[in-house]
């Protein structure tokens, strides 16, 4: 029988919900910075592409994020803790070979952490080009990343208190910016109709391969489960309702701008920054940059937790683990910190722009999600005693969705070979 944890039964308060915003939604919450731009790319802008893209984003968030992670996967708490290795700890006695999806999932999740901070921070900083044309962004991004990793040894107990309020401001900004465009062109809401997703995937030339870009909207879903121990199931589920509304409103707002901006192609523009009023552009970029830093911090902390769990399961060599503050659960692993810093800076120098990073981002996390689905099926059958036919149906649906994303992301291997090598090295260490 699963042990209950007080973190799941504690009273939901405004303060606890704001804390949840600052801890777990950084990755998925900063996706509007680059997702629609990645979908449109250099293609001609038309109704099927724009509305189909929004429709795919909406239904991906419904199925992959809301149903699979927020509803189903959060049920699998290991004494209040979440994450793929905690899930493995719950089911490992039901099959010796389950160690394979556990290690593979953990490996790809850690490898994904090499490119998430660079793409998030670079996407935000590149907005400065609208205010200060020709300003070199690469040095700024490297300085921010380096400062972030240097700061890790001191812990985030004090500054962590502002993460929640900053992310609350960020999501409110997403909501207002999106709504300001929707009220101008309300007809774009019809993009939520799954018919447009069907049109994009089956009728639009090369539409299926656009799933590789659509997937970027849900890459942060795994973090919702990984950070279960920090926030609790109830806080995640309630706060997700607010976050989802803000995200969708912004995506639809960007689509409204795309449908009425008057140009055949994006011409290098980012829809996210185009819907920000000129008078608010600099404050908006500053808020976006802070949100991207918080998103990166959450991922770095998650990497420490992942390695700590791997050490406890004898999946990773024993390395120095420090506790920089008295805050429960906060750890710092110098060797992992150095590894992530080198990987992130290398990614910035190699790709040079967020557009190039988009072409490589998402491949690893599709594998993590498929491995989570495999482990989750054993949890539902053997721990929750769900009907096997029901579980097989669930696995089939999510397996089909995730395998489609995986196939669409395979074309990214060409630009992802260095990170593929990094992932292989991590897998060999484990």
Annotate the PLM regions.
Residues 1-430:
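The structured alpha-helical core of multi-pass membrane proteins
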């Amino acid at each position: 029988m699963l042990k209950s944890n007080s973190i799941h039964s504690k009273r939901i308060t405004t303060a606890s919900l704001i804390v949840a915003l600052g801890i777990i939604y950084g990755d998925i919450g900063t996706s509007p910075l680059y997702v629609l731009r990645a979908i449109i790319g250099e293609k001609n802008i038309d109704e099927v592409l724009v509305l189909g893209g929004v429709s795919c984003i909406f239904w991906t968030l419904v199925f992959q994020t809301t149903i699979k992670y927020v509803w189903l996967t959060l049920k699998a708490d290991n004494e209040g803790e979440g994450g793929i290795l905690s899930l493995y700890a719950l089911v490992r006695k039901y099959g010796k070979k389950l160690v394979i999806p556990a290690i593979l999932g953990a490996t790809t999740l850690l490898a994904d952490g090499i490119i998430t901070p660079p793409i998030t921070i670079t996407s935000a900083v590149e907005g400065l080009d609208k205010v200060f044309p020709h300003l070199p962004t690469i040095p700024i991004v490297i300085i921010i990343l380096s400062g972030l990793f240097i700061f890790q040894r001191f812990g985030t107990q004090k500054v962590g208190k502002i993460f929640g309020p900053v992310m609350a401001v960020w999501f409110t900004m997403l909501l207002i910016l999106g709504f300001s465009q929707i009220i101008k062109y309300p007809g774009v809401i019809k993009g939520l109709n799954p018919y447009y997703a069907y049109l994009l995937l089956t009728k639009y030339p090369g539409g299926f391969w656009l799933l590789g870009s659509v997937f970027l909207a849900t890459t942060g879903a795994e973090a919702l489960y990984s950070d279960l121990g920090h926030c609790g199931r109830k806080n995640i589920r309630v706060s997700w309702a607010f976050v989802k509304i803000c995200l969708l409103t912004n995506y639809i707002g960007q689509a409204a701008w795309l449908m009425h901006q008057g140009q055949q192609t994006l011409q290098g523009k980012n829809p996210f920054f185009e819907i920000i009023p000129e008078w608010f552009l600099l404050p908006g970029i500053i808020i976006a940059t802070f949100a991207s830093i918080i998103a990166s911090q959450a991922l770095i902390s998650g990497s420490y937790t992942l390695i700590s769990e791997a050490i406890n399961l004898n999946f990773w060599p024993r390395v120095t683990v420090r506790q920089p503050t008295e805050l429960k659960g906060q750890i710092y692993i110098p060797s992992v910190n150095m590894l992530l810093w080198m990987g992130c800076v290398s990614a910035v120098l190699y790709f040079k722009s967020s557009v190039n990073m988009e072409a490589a981002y998402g491949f690893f996390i599709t594998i993590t999600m498929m491995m989570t689905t495999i482990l989750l099926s054993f949890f539902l059958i053997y721990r929750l005693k769900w009907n096997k036919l029901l579980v097989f149906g669930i696995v089939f649906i999510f397996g089909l969705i995730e395998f489609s994303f995986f196939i669409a992301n395979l074309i990214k291997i060409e630009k992802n070979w260095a990170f593929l090598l990094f992932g292989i090295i991590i897998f060999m260490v484990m």
